[in-house]
UniProtKB/Swiss-Prot annotation:
Disulfide bonds: none annotated. InterPro entries: AAA+_ATPase, G_ENGA, GTP-bd, GTPase_Der, KH_dom-like, KH_dom-like_a/b, P-loop_NTPase, Small_GTP-bd. One of its GO terms (biological process) is ribosome biogenesis. Keywords: GTP-binding, Nucleotide-binding, Repeat, Ribosome biogenesis. The lineage of its organism: Bacteria, Pseudomonadati, Pseudomonadota, Gammaproteobacteria, Lysobacterales. Belongs to the TRAFAC class TrmE-Era-EngA-EngB-Septin-like GTPase superfamily. EngA (Der) GTPase family. One of its GO terms (molecular function) is ribosome binding. This is GTPase Der. HAMAP family: GTPase_Der. GTP 2 binds at residues 185-192, 232-236, 297-300. Associates with the 50S ribosomal subunit. Residues 3-167, 179-352 form the EngA-type G domain. GTPase that plays an essential role in the late steps of ribosome biogenesis. The keyword Nucleotidyltransferase does not apply.
């Protein structure tokens, strides 16, 4: 296990900027606005290959124990409590504050090894800034400007000198057998509540306030002997309602999470049905070609009549993805969790199945003989052979002639035939049609000597007339 370093401080002192500098990533959202970070975000610092360590970015502690601010503070305290070293970050431009004093008092009670990090010293007198924070009594102080990457090397030296060889941090592995699941949907449909329920702890901040989750946070889970990576994402609103830059960044991170996952769980609110924005998010999942499971949350609070209405709306608005399984759950009370994971397993197995060329050609032959392509303006498409073209989604490349006139209805027939034959559920299926090149196209047959002589006689005869 690697040593764990926690970044702690009040809002907007630059913790996320330091996190990005140490991890050489842009994983943490950064904006000149307090309260951007809320959930714990873990990364690995490998700037010194001899001594890598885990860094955890935390939300700013604002001194309020209620609502989102209180939940954010609890997340920060949890991170500091499990850390081997705490980096207490303060703002060198604004100077010390009463909130810094409160955080320092709490850190002293925690009794974890702590380094004072004075950020944003660019444009200031460093000695003056250091003297202002001297009353905190730290022997280990690092002054830096994370935005300009000044002082990061000094910070690494200080951290390296204080870290144990073994620590309490667990590294997110790159095990290809680990199923990557992204929970996506509109704001306030219960994504964070569901992830917390699966983890058995308040790992994500869950609130009735829409837009609570700002970043895409990945955590590992072992359940029934299988390994998963759960990705909690920010809710996606309609583009016309997205005004703040932070929300635009959050939306980008959510779309990025969809691209990187293997199974996307689209969460719907049973009390609101299927909205146009739900369909837009579904479109993003289909564009990425990801396996899909639809989770209808808050199902337990609905009457029989409301459930019947929701089922009817679901079949009408999501009929075009009838291949995706829909699971009724309650993230708050934990009902439907087993059914949800069973659907995820089936979708993942279908999306990542490796097909042999012989079995897909046999399927194409049966489909072709059972229902040949129709004649279009006297032209009939011929399907010669097919081979696998990849997974997630399953892709089949069909070769033949006159495929440009192959009607869409026949392409849907092939998709449905392959789904039924190979029992593919919960995943899109992609067909690519390629026509074989005509080797004689653009070429003329060479004439024999006899044909040349005949052509000359014919031309003399025509001219003679």
């Amino acid at each position: 296990m690697l040593p764990l370093v926690a970044l702690v401080g009040r809002p907007n002192v630059g913790k996320s900027t330091i996190f990005n500098a140490l991890t050489r990533t842009r994983d943490a959202l950064v904006h000149d606005q307090p309260g951007v970070t809320r959930d714990r975000n873990y990364g690995v610092c490998r700037l010194d290959e001899q001594q890598p360590f885990i860094v955890v970015d935390t939300g700013g502690i604002a001194g309020d124990e209620d609502g989102l601010a209180g939940a954010t503070a609890r997340q920060a305290r949890a991170a500091a409590g499990e850390a081997d070293l705490v980096l207490f970050v303060v703002d060198g431009r604004e100077g010390e504050s009463s909130l810094d004093d409160e955080i320092l008092a709490w850190l002293r009670k925690l009794a974890r090894p702590t380094v004072l990090v004075i950020n944003k010293i660019d444009g200031t007198d460093e000695e003056t800034v250091r003297s202002e924070f001297a009353r905190y009594g730290f022997s280990d102080v690092v002054a830096l400007s994370a935005a300009h990457r000044q002082g990061i090397d000094e910070l690494l030296e200080e951290v390296g000198a204080r870290l144990p060889e073994e620590g309490s941090g667990e590294l997110l592995d790159n095990d290809p057998a680990r199923v990557r699941i992204a929970f996506v949907g509109r704001p306030n449909v219960g994504k964070s509540t569901l992830v917390n329920r699966l983890l058995g702890e308040e790992r994500m901040i869950a609130s009735e306030v829409p837009g609570t989750t700002r970043d895409s946070i990945a955590v590992d889970l072992e359940r029934d002997g299988r390994q998963y990576r759960l990705i909690d994402t920010a809710g996606l609103r309609r583009r016309g309602k997205v005004e703040e830059a932070v929300e635009k960044f959050s939306a980008f991170k959510t779309l990025q999470a969809i691209e990187r996952c293997q199974v996307a769980v689209l969460m719907l609110d049973a009390t609101e049905g299927v909205t146009d924005q739900d369909a837009t998010i579904l479109g993003a999942i289909l564009d990425a070609g990801r396996a899909l499971v639809v989770a209808i949350n808050k199902w337990d609070g609905q009457s029989d009549y409301q459930r019947a209405q929701a089922e009817d709306l679901l079949s009408r608005k999501l009929g075009f993805v009838s291949w995706a399984e829909a699971v009724r759950i309650s993230a708050l009370h934990g009902s439907g969790m087993r059914e949800l994971f069973q659907a995820i397993h089936r979708a993942h197995a279908s999306a990542t199945h490796e097909f042999s060329t012989s079995e897909v050609n046999q399927a194409l032959e049966i489909a072709y003989e059972t229902n040949p392509p129709p004649s279009i303006r006297g032209h009939v498409s011929k399907l010669r052979y097919v081979h696998p073209g990849g997974a997630n989604p399953p892709t089949f490349i069909v070769h033949g002639t006159r495929l440009k006139v192959l009607p869409e209805s026949y392409k849907r027939y092939l998709e449905n035939f392959f789904r039924k034959r190979f029992k593919l559920v919960g995943t899109p299926v992609c067909f690519i049609f390629r026509e074989g090149a005509n080797p004689y196209e653009g070429k003329k047959n060479p004439l024999s000597d006899r044909q040349v002589a005949r052509k000359r006689r014919l031309m003399r005869h025509v001219k003679g007339k």
